């Protein structure tokens, strides 16, 4: 495979980052932590939320979405409604109970049936143990319990039943996990798809103003939060509530209200203490996470700038700075461990006090002849069974609180509305009816920021099947014109029409399906060459993909690769040279076969030889199509039917190459400047 040199890689990557606003540092930082995250799916009980697996869609949003060159855009006011925790839980419940999917509803019912079955058998374990002990320790047991004797016959049978109850409870728990996992994973899948679809529905203005790192964190944390909350609800909160209720009722029925009161008071104290301590520990944990992030960021930044560190012999300096930040993490982590020890001691003290009180009452009952040794064992067993779910209460509470916060951010994001292509409005519009593909701008005004006008009342027309080149200095509004046609932005005033139809009054999908784009920086998917070409028309056959590659003059090059069309192009296509990537973009355009072609300085970053080859292919692609070329090199512009010269958002000259040279105006000056550079 033809590989670009290290210098070409750096230049290509730098060009992409400068034009698209791609944050290389954040990307590496994010990727680093992706590697060290543990993969996990719905577990029981849940661990800390930070260790659960992220949504499959998060890598997809790790780069800022851009089109052509970057321009500063006006802040987009967020149109969001306040999302309460109750509404979030209600929304999750709606995904859990999908009325249109009876199989999933049956799984939900089955999971709750397994939950009840597990807890019912769980409370039988201490009871059966009590029966066995009383039977073995009291000679009067057989006479006073004829029904139990008839049911079990021997103490060994009771102990076998004890084992069956324990195993059955465990089996129901595992069956509940197995049955409910399908529901939980489908819920996560449904919401993840909705998030990705929402990302693509939002307009470019939103993406230009949204911090990529913040957006990525919202999606990542929100998807993990779904897993956390579902785990907490199904595997911790609901089972614990059910078990506390059952234990309290059994104790009240068998031994009196005082035992139920002890249970309720101890559980209430335990929960209150745990929640108060957890609130304090959340603050400590937050400080620890921040310190850890600072240290990790410093280490990664140092490694990213490895060569710079070596140039100035600053290895010791970097190590000291990292050590200072890691010391902050060490202090915070130590504080966290101390608070955790205090939490454990407090929980143990409350539980031990309640258990001791109950045991003292039981011993008095035994001394008075009102209770048996088996009763003491039963009370002890019932109370101990509450200790495990209560032990995880702090983790569950902190994860649930954080999960609700993260989900609020994600659901607010889902409530964002797009200024362009709102589906409710768009589906009511008629499709674009092509009659040749003529394009007209009628007194168009546009600005990204109120104080900076980009297009200032421009008007021009591109006849169907003709080609127009737009030239001018940087910032004159050339690429913005292409954005207007593709309707990434709407005009502030004026009209953009295709075949006499205002593009705001036609269905967005039909508009964009009629337009092909060849950008300056072709960013490819990290997939095969075949996939990247096929992406231009997903309904195309293999032979049509090969024909498109031949027309783009890249088929022979691909066939020389060891894996041919199955060759992976690498992240953003960096395994291919600039010319090869442009040919892939051209092959996509051939495959799409649009009526209108937009090219944004498609050859400006290429050498002269590659430019000539690409231009030859472009002329073939542009044949009998309405084409607009944003041209940096005027050798591209001179071959078009008409040239528009732009300055400060206005068309200052227009005509053919020869006519504009004859005017000795702005175009002639640009031509002279470029030729002078070539001569030098």
Swiss-Prot record:
Residues 108-402 form the ABC transmembrane type-1 domain. Pfam families: ABC_membrane (PF00664), ABC_tran (PF00005). One of its GO terms (molecular function) is ATP hydrolysis activity. ATP binds at residues 448, 472-483. The keyword DNA damage does not apply. Its main location: mitochondrion. Mostly expressed at low levels in roots and flowers. Residues 439-673 form the ABC transporter domain. Keywords: ATP-binding, Ion transport, Iron, Iron transport, Membrane, Mitochondrion, Mitochondrion inner membrane, Nucleotide-binding, Transit peptide, Transmembrane, Transmembrane helix, Transport. Induction: In leaves after iron deprivation. Residues 1-75 form a transit peptide. It is a multi-pass membrane protein. The chain crosses the membrane at residues 109-129, 145-165, 232-252, 255-275, 340-360, 376-396. One of its GO terms (biological process) is response to cadmium ion. Disruption phenotype: No visible phenotype. It comes from the Eukaryota. It is found in: Mitochondrion inner membrane. One of its GO terms (cellular component) is mitochondrion. Performs an essential function in the generation of cytoplasmic iron-sulfur proteins by mediating export of Fe/S cluster precursors synthesized by NFS1 and other mitochondrial proteins. Not involved in the export of cyclic pyranopterin monophosphate (cPMP) from mitochondria to the cytosol. Belongs to the ABC transporter superfamily. ABCB family. Heavy Metal importer (TC 3.A.1.210) subfamily. Homodimer. This is ABC transporter B family member 24, mitochondrial. It comes from Arabidopsis thaliana (Mouse-ear cress).
């Amino acid at each position: 495979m033809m590989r670009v040199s290290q210098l070409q890689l750096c230049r290509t990557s730098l060009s992409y980052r400068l034009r698209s606003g791609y944050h290389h540092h954040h990307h590496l930082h994010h990727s680093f932590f992706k590697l060290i995250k543990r993969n996990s799916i719905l577990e029981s009980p849940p661990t800390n939320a930070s260790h659960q697996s992220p949504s499959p869609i998060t890598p997809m949003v790790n780069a800022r979405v851009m089109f052509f060159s970057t321009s500063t855009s006006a802040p987009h006011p967020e149109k969001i409604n306040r999302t309460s925790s109750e509404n979030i839980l209600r929304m999750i419940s709606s995904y859990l109970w999908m009325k249109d999917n009876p199989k999933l509803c049956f799984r939900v019912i089955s999971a709750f049936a397994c939950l009840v079955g597990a807890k019912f058998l769980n409370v039988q374990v201490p009871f059966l143990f009590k029966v066995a002990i009383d039977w073995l320790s009291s000679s009067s047991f057989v006479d006073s319990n004829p029904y139990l004797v008839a049911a079990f016959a021997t103490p060994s049978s009771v102990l076998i039943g004890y084992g069956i109850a324990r195993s059955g409870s465990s089996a129901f728990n595992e069956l509940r996990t197995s049955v409910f996992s399908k529901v939980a994973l489908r819920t996560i899948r449904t919401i993840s798809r909705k998030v990705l679809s929402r990302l693509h529905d939002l307009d470019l203005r939103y993406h230009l103003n949204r911090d990529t790192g913040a957006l990525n964190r919202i999606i990542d944390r929100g998807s993990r939060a779904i897993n956390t909350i579902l785990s907490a609800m199904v595997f911790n909160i609901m089972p614990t509530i059910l078990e506390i209720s059952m234990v309290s009722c059994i104790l009240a029925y068998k031994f009196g209200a005082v035992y139920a009161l002890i249970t309720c008071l101890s559980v209430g104290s335990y929960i209150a203490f745990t929640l108060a301590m957890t609130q304090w520990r959340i603050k400590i944990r937050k400080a620890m996470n921040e310190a850890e992030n600072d240290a990790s960021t410093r280490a990664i930044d140092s490694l990213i700038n490895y060569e710079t560190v070596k140039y100035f012999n600053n290895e010791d300096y970097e190590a000291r700075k990292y050590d200072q930040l890691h010391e902050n993490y060490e202090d915070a982590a130590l504080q966290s461990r101390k608070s955790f020890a205090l939490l454990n001691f407090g929980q143990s003290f409350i539980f031990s006090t309640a258990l001791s009180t109950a045991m003292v009452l039981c011993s008095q009952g035994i001394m008075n002849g009102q209770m048996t040794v088996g009763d003491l064992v039963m009370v002890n067993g019932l109370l101990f069974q509450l200790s495990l779910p209560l032990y995880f209460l702090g983790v569950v509470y902190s994860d649930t609180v954080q999960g609700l916060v993260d989900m609020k951010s994600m659901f607010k994001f889902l409530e964002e509305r797009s200024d362009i292509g709102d589906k409710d409005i768009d589906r009511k519009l008629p499709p674009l009816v092509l009659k040749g593909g003529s394009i007209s701008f009628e007194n168009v005004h546009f600005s990204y920021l109120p104080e900076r006008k980009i297009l200032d009342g421009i008007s021009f027309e591109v006849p169907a099947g003709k080609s127009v080149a737009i030239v001018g200095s940087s910032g004159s509004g050339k690429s913005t014109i292409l954005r207007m046609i593709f309707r990434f932005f709407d005009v502030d005033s004026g009209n953009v029409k295709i075949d006499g139809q205002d593009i705001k009054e036609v269905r967005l999908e039909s508009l964009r399906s009629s337009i092909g784009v060849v950008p300056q920086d072709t960013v490819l998917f990290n997939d095969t060459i075949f996939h990247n070409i096929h992406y231009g028309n997903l309904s195309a056959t293999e032979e049509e993909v090969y024909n498109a590659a031949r027309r783009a003059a890249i088929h022979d090059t691909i066939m020389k690769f060891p894996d041919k069309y199955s060759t992976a192009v690498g992240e953003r296509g960096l395994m291919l040279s600039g010319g090869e990537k442009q040919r892939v973009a051209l092959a996509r355009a051939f495959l799409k076969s649009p009526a209108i072609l937009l090219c944004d300085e498609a050859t400006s970053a290429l050498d002269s030889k590659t430019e000539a080859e690409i231009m030859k292919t472009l002329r073939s692609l542009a044949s009998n199509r309405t084409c607009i070329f944003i041209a940096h090199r005027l050798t591209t512009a001179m071959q078009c039917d008409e040239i528009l010269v732009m300055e400060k958002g206005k068309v200052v000259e227009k005509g053919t190459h020869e006519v504009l040279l004859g005017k000795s105006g702005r175009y002639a000056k640009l031509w002279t400047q470029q030729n002078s550079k070539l001569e030098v």
